[in-house]
Amino acid sequence: MASSCSRRLLAAALLPWCCAAWALGHLDPPSPPPLVIWHGMGDSCCNPMSMGVIKKMVEKEIPGIYVLSLEIGKNMMEDVENSFFLNVNVQVNMVCQILEKDPKLQQGYNAIGFSQGGQFLRAVAQRCPTPPMMTLISVGGQHQGVFGLPRCPGESSHICDFIRKSLNAGAYSKLVQERLVQAQYWHDPIKESVYRNYSIFLADINQERCVNESYKKNLMALKKFVMVKFFNDSIVDPVDSEWFGFYRSGQAKETIPLQESTLYTEDRLGLKKMDKAGKLVFLAKEGDHLQISKEWFTAHIIPFLK
């Protein structure tokens, strides 16, 4: 029979393990990664019919998640106006500062960009690695730009008529480039050299003029880069841009996929390495621009946010 001294020694040895097991059993489950959302053209952070719905949907499906829907400006009206008229580089810089100062994002975050918000958040990933973006989901984003503005959503059509005329008159003039957001990702495949030299946003983040190794390194740090393409999109021209494809240089009829582009074959942005590593995810959906049901969003997007 064990002596009382032996029993005391055994109890003393087991006590720390018992306490540790008890503590582990009572730890709160880890919080889900926070989410940052950037809306599209003519929309706002908090529109109850668009981004407000998305925010509530995410919060319902992932209890306890922190969702930051970006407002570019002092109020919703200014947010909408800035989606048309505030220099994208200024917007990206503003967002980088917002994210850097938010204590809830410092361990990393996931991001969803809707329409032009997709390429804007990619610029954030490339230019501002702190705090780290983990997964980027681009829903209808135009990563190789657009060459046409066929239709505008909602009540913004009159603004788009003005923008369309300005783009046709001189998309790469200094005045238009600095004052119209859509001009800053306007990509003329017939005038590639003009685009490369005078595009103040897209040509930069797509490494058209030179290779910024920091951009490449920062983008490759993503765990996943998810791109959603809408087969019946009547707003994005060409729709292939939503998967990083575009018109073959020198004409505006035949499109080529990302994998046939110089950006990919020369791996100027790290997309080829990301593709080989399984980090690029290409999702396709029937329907027009940003036509997403709750069921589709829950089945295809929510899993990337957990």
UniProtKB/Swiss-Prot annotation:
Query: So which residues are the signal peptide here?
Result: 1-27
Q: GO: which molecular function terms?
A: long-chain fatty acyl-CoA hydrolase activity; lysophosphatidic acid binding; palmitoyl-(protein) hydrolase activity; phospholipase A2 inhibitor activity; sulfatide binding
Name of the top EC class for this enzyme: hydrolase
Q: Which cysteines are joined by disulfide bonds?
A: C45-C46, C96-C128, C152-C160
- What EC numbers are recorded for this enzyme? 3.1.2.2, 3.1.2.22
PTM section of the record: Glycosylated.
Catalyses which reaction?
S-hexadecanoyl-L-cysteinyl-[protein] + H2O = L-cysteinyl-[protein] + hexadecanoate + H(+); hexadecanoyl-CoA + H2O = hexadecanoate + CoA + H(+); S-hexadecanoyl-N-acetylcysteamine + H2O = N-acetylcysteamine + hexadecanoate + H(+); S-hexadecanoyl-N-acetylcysteine methyl ester + H2O = N-acetylcysteine methyl ester + hexadecanoate + H(+)
Give the keywords, sorted: Disulfide bond, Endoplasmic reticulum, Glycoprotein, Golgi apparatus, Hydrolase, Lysosome, Secreted, Signal
> Record's superkingdom?
Eukaryota
Q: In which tissues is it expressed?
A: Highest level in testis and kidney, lower in heart, brain and lung and lowest in skeletal muscle.
Give the sugar-modified residues. N197, N212, N232
Question: What happens in the null mutant?
Answer: Ppt1-knockout mice are viable and fertile; however they developp a neurodegenerative disorder that closely parallels infantile neuronal ceroid lipofuscinosis disease. Mortality reached 50% among the deficient mice by 7 months and few mice survived past 10 months.
Q: What does this protein do?
A: Has thioesterase activity against fatty acid thioesters with 14 -18 carbons, including palmitoyl-CoA, S-palmitoyl-N-acetylcysteamine, and palmitoylated proteins. In contrast to PPT2, PPT1 can hydrolyze palmitoylated proteins and palmitoylcysteine.
| Quaternary state and interactors | Interacts with CLN5, ATP5F1A and ATP5F1B.
Name-wise, this protein is Palmitoyl-protein thioesterase 1
The organism's taxonomy opens as:
Eukaryota, Metazoa, Chordata, Craniata, Vertebrata
